[in-house]
Amino acid sequence: MSALAARRATAAAASPKPEQPESSIEEVSVSGALTLPSPKRRKTRQTSPKPRSKARYSDDVPTSRQFFQATESLAEQRTGRFSPSAPDSDGGTSSSSVGDSDEDMAQEDEFEDRREVDGERDQRKVSVAANMSSSGPFKSLDLMPVDITSQFNPKDNVNFCRITEGQLASAEMNDGHPGPGVIVSLARNESLTIAGLFLLTPLQNTLSIYSTALSPSMSSFPVYAPTSHPLPVISPASTQAPGKGTLSILNNIKLPLSFQKESDKTLLLIRENRCGIDGLRNGAVPGFSNIWLEDNGPWGLRGVHPVVGSFPVPVYPYCTPPSWSHAISSLSSSDVNLQTPFVGLVKGPKRSGKSTFARALLNNLLRRFRKVAWLECDLGQGEFGSGAVVGLWILDKPALGPPFTHPLLPSRSHYLGTYTPLTCPDEYLVAIRHLIEHYKYELQYTSEYSALHTTVHDKISTHVPLVINTQGWMKGLGEELLNVIESMAQPTRVFSFESQSEEVYSGQGWTSTPPWQATQLPYDPAYPTTEPVETEVTQTYSLETAPVSALQARYTPADLRVLSAITYFHASLHPTQSVPVTWDISSPLVCTIPWEVELGIGKALEKVYLIGEGSEGVLEEDLPIALNGAIVALAEMLGSYEDEPTVYEQGRSPPPTDLVNILGLAVIRSLSSGNSVNPGLKLQLLTPLPPSYLSRARILIKSGALELPLPGMIDWRRGGINEEGMLGKGWEEIPFLDVGGLDVIGGERRRFRKNIMRKGM
């Protein structure tokens, strides 16, 4: 042994070994307790160490799953996996390599990410206090403490009671929704999370769901809770509405003597919601077949799945941040009255919860007002209509669910034919300006006398408040458009979401741009052309972003647009919101019976307008090719407009916005040319519009930027598609689809060799 080695051995023996502390809960993070990897070392042929007998992250280091086993012993409650590619165990991973190469580092990062998703997968009560990674769409966002499972333990005839359809009928619960139900009694500190489709009826005291307070009422509220979105948490409201304690129907239902129905308990009735949207489980939209779970629920109700204890699929709950609660509670103040019409504008970046808060704002305004107006400025993700449309909607009932679950007919709307105002900023502002003027002069003040409606929940009916949902484009041109919209709307309250902080590089040679500030020029009475700017006091609320979850990355905005488009064309809309929306997704669009409408001068549809880039290049003889299989907007004319008496003219601009009202969208499934006796075109239309609205349509507007998604063109039923084709036709006979591959260099299937770097090769 050399002298240097002897000195090292002596020093190692003399130095005391530090005691290994026992692993505690505080020392283990939720995302997984992994030791830091050792720095990379250069591998050489002679000095490479021997392969390690166990992995870098060995079993003596507690993992995230071991942490939860030590706290709540939830490993036995796990009944579902996040994906088929998830690992079966989180134990140590052995490797025959050195462990310091780039390949090993990538594998270890992959297992670390899987452990992070496992932490989101477990159905347990866990307070998440760690920050998300700065990479990806979640940059520097603090996760809120959330409870994934319900704080409710159902006990038969104590806080949970099954009610038959006959008992509901004898109690005069005749609202057109057949089927049995259950009555749940919630204490002050209890909550109930439910996935699926159900009807909610508050029976005693006010409850809270989706940041919305619901008081006892004879009305039943349809709730849509797919697992692709945050699940609603039902809990007693923090403040109870005076004079609305118990519903009279509760006295007509015979409940067991042991059932808890004291005055401090919150009682609610849950029934089946047979609307048809659960037909998505048949495979109409790929990736969304399992968002409604199974048909039979554990409570014996169809499509109702309470999240109590363990749950077979990964879910995450809907949470209300404190700043949201403060902003919503301010709506009950005395300034929201007849003297000050409420105009609220919600703005914020993408994925901040802007549309979710705006929907909660709308629902809470409906507690005081008979009707509330909604101005949609987001072309990409419309709340009550399909994309590429800006419009005004008038609502008298709350919307409890994601946007694709409550499509409604607009009061006034305009079709731009694109998902972004980048290509048409001028037309975008003109359409919104007209909608704001239409609201101020036609909808804001009603002719109804408020005394006629004071007996119905004491709601205000003399004027209609407005909620403006803006787009998430907050930089460059998007910021300029947002400022113009705010100046046109003149909101009384602005709800602004905090922008995500960006990492600014401050190295050598880089400087940060100073913030831009606007200053109003002083008023000079010497110049009569200059008018003083009258500024009203606008209350501004700063809101924190919605809590994020790793499960949100499963679906992109493009996926949600496809889901919204397919469900829109499978829906059946009604002129009034009192009749709920229904869906028929039992068969694909290619098998749906269409409307046959004639297109021509003096026919049902008289004119066609093409908008968007490249529309001016479509010749008149190519019009059938441009319309066949396209998504078009059906519009009505509200006044006379001097135009050429032809069906289509190349390069013709559409009528002014004040003369056109978009009724809805339609798909031209096919068309056929007329003959000499009956010239024109016969169109086969698929549209969710009712016949009364379809008969008002006079013109078609088509944009080349909006196309029908692929799931709307195929037969997605089991056995509907094979290698030869679908519907008994070969692929070469199927319109609008090209299944054959491209004959290009490198387009063939790649083959991988497995004998590279073998010995003797």
Swiss-Prot record:
Keywords: ATP-binding, Kinase, Nucleotide-binding, Nucleus, rRNA processing, Transferase
EC numbers on record: 2.7.1.-
Presence of the UniProt keyword Methyltransferase in the record: no
Family: Belongs to the Clp1 family. NOL9/GRC3 subfamily.
Source species: Cryptococcus neoformans var. neoformans serotype D (strain JEC21 / ATCC MYA-565)
Cited InterPro entries: Clp1/Grc3 (IPR045116), CLP1_P (IPR032319), P-loop_NTPase (IPR027417)
PANTHER family (alphabetical): CLEAVAGE/POLYADENYLATION FACTOR IA SUBUNIT CLP1P (PTHR12755), POLYNUCLEOTIDE 5'-HYDROXYL-KINASE NOL9 (PTHR12755:SF3)
GO cellular component: nucleolus; nucleus
Region ranges (Disordered): 1-131
Function in brief: Polynucleotide 5'-kinase involved in rRNA processing.
Compartment list: Nucleus, Nucleolus
Coiled-coil residue spans: none
Subcellular location, principal: nucleus
Biased composition (Basic residues): 39-55
Name the record gives this protein: Polynucleotide 5'-hydroxyl-kinase GRC3
Biological processes, Gene Ontology terms: cleavage in ITS2 between 5.8S rRNA and LSU-rRNA of tricistronic rRNA transcript (SSU-rRNA, 5.8S rRNA, LSU-rRNA); rRNA processing
Biased segments, Polar residues type: 61-82
Ranges annotated as biased composition (Acidic residues): 100-111
This protein's record includes keyword Aminoacyl-tRNA synthetase: no
Molecular-function GO terms, alphabetical: ATP binding; polynucleotide 5'-hydroxyl-kinase activity
Residues that hold ATP according to the record: 348-355
Gene assigned in the entry: GRC3
Biased composition (Low complexity): 1-14, 83-99
